[in-house]
Amino acid sequence: MTTTINTPHKLIKNGIEIGDWVIHTSKNPILKSTEKEEWEKELVLNGLPEMVYGNNFIRLSNEKRDITIVFNCMDALKMLDKVADQSIKVSSSKKWEEINKGFEGQIEKSFEWTFSSPYTGTILTRGHCYSNFEKPIGLFENTTEKIDIEKLKRPDPILFFDDVLLYEDELADNGSSMLSVKIRVNNESVFLLSRFFLRVDDVICRCLDTRIYHEFGKDYLLKEVTFKESSFDIIKPYSENDPTLLTDSNFIVSKLPIKSLTTEKILLSYNDNK
């Protein structure tokens, strides 16, 4: 028999207060061309995605434990390589031809046109900002514990849900590159999924999923990072009966082989004895 936990909560504008957490999302129009130019200068990048939702984010804050977890566009773009991924050079790609038209130097100086970011979120605590590989002692802990998928499948009432797009590019009609974040809150837990998805037609498919799961009352959050990648050949046969599957990111991701999977705890006790 399943016991239902009723965590005190209150809906707020674009978010929810639940337990010790305040969860907030922001969804706004794409950056204007002048704003994109400013971002390119700040990020020292020669190109940005066609659609940059620079003012979008998802934020989970626990003031009592002095920790905030954020997923935003700027931090994701900061992690882009400064040059193109040479492993995805496509001689017939219009995108590849366009970004190098008239360029007389080394091809490596062109921008990373797939916008493949290894971003897995930002953590703010003790006045510091940490992302990806920055892991202060005591904040993270390796674990074999897995996110309970069966609990996520239960038809529990959803108190709050949002789906936030951070950036998107159609690669000059040669595929798709997109970073989005979804969040779902019920009485017992919060679940977040950040997904970077890349499809370069006839070349490659790639996915980086970051899942964060927290059961209210527990002293930690689980963070699971999964990287998948394959040549386009593994997907193409499925399109023979249904061509629309080639543009269905969820379907494609379900067919990609896992290249790496890491799970760790984000410890809320990190600030207890500061």
Swiss-Prot record:
Lineage top rank: taxon: Eukaryota
GO cellular component, one term: cytosol
Cysteine pairings via disulfide bonds: none
A Pfam entry, by short name: TIP41
Single GO biological process annotation from the record: TOR signaling
Coiled-coil stretches: none
InterPro entries from the UniProt entry: Phosphatase_reg/MetRdx, TIP41-like
GO molecular function, one term: protein phosphatase activator activity
Similarity remark: Belongs to the TIP41 family.
Identification of the protein by name: TIP41-like protein
Organism: Dictyostelium discoideum
